[in-house]
């Protein structure tokens, strides 16, 4: 129990919110804090046909028994989270493919980027490209990037682009290290 004291947990969750009387489903991440509080981030860059069906909401919602199914809604907040004495942002999957999303989060104060992902639906080749996108974001924004993949490739990348840890494809592993915020 003492080993976990002061530990933060970041994971993915499906999240439902009722906004202005409309049920909205989000692909979200949650950060659980040591004091029992939490915060969430809603994925901004949704993948067509995987997380939403284009134009689906426009016609299916006219049949009111289907008012809350069909797809995720995109998030709109570029959040940073305080973790002890530094600020972090959490990206979900292909949020990391958008330089604008990462740049905005860093502009908002993020000193480190966490990427949580599930690359199971993209075959054997794309997880390698996805990891290289994480590396590109680290170099572009000069911040460390930690990618945690339940399928795909996990790793720790320094702002220089140096990979200090990289798992094998789809490897279940635990790796811990102190990540410097500035290389």
Regions found by a protein language model. Give the residues of each.
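Enzyme catalytic cores with a strong preference for nitrogen-chemistry domains
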Residues: 1-183
């Amino acid at each position: 129990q003492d080993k976990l004291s002061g530990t933060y947990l970041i994971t993915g969750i499906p999240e439902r919110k009722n906004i202005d009387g409309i049920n909205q489903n989000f692909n979200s991440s949650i950060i659980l804090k040591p004091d029992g509080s939490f915060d969430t981030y809603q994925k901004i860059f949704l993948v067509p046909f995987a997380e939403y069906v284009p134009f689906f909401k426009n016609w299916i919602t006219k049949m009111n028994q289907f008012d809350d199914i069909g797809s995720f809604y995109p998030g709109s907040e570029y959040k940073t989270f305080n973790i002890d004495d530094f600020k972090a942002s959490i990206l979900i999957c292909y949020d990391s493919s958008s330089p604008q999303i990462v740049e905005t989060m860093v502009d908002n104060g993020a000193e480190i980027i966490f990427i949580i992902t599930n690359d199971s639906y993209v075959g054997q080749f794309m997880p390698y490209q996805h990891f290289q996108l994480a590396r590109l974001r680290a170099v572009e924004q000069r911040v460390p990037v930690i990618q945690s993949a339940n399928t795909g490739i996990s790793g720790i990348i320094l702002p220089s682009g140096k990979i200090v840890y990289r798992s094998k494809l789809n490897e279940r592993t635990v790796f811990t290290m102190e990540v410097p915020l500035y290389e």
